[in-house]
């Protein structure tokens, strides 16, 4: 992958976490939940360390979150390549496109703060 991620660190062994912020249709919360549950097995099968998905509970009713960690940028790139060819992943992406319960998706890549 090229672009902003490739310039974060010269060290390819820095752990990264992908934070995904979803703006969802609040009237299709159950459909988004089914979509999120499918990722619980797809993401680990493709090499991501899924921290979890979070649905709105109190307050804002149209924002959901996901966190996926990787030991390095190279591991993230390997994960993306696997995900592109995964039939279950393709089916889940197609479901989201057909049902249109995701209105917007934002990705932020984070690195941990360490003592050293």
Give the positions of each predicted feature.
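Short, low-order "capping/linker" segments at domain edges
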Residues: 106-116
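Short acidic/glycine-enriched loop/turn segments that link adjacent beta-strands
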Residues: 59-62
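Active-site-flanking beta-strand signature of metal-NTP-handling nucleotidyl enzymes
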Residues: 16-22, 65
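An amphipathic, aromatic/His-enriched active-site/gating alpha helix that lines ligand/cofactor pockets
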Residues: 31-51, 69-106
């Amino acid at each position: 992958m090229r672009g902003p991620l490739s310039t974060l660190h010269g060290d390819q062994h820095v752990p990264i976490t992908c934070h995904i912020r979803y703006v969802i249709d609040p009237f299709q919360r159950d459909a988004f939940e089914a979509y999120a549950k499918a990722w619980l097995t797809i993401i680990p099968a493709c090499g991501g360390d899924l921290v979890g998905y979070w649905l709105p509970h109190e307050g804002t009713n149209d924002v959901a979150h996901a966190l996926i960690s990787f030991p390095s940028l190279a591991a993230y790139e390997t994960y993306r390549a696997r995900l592109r060819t995964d039939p279950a992943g393709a089916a889940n992406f197609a479901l989201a496109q057909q049902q249109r319960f995701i209105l917007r998706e934002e990705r932020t890549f984070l690195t941990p703060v360490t003592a050293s």
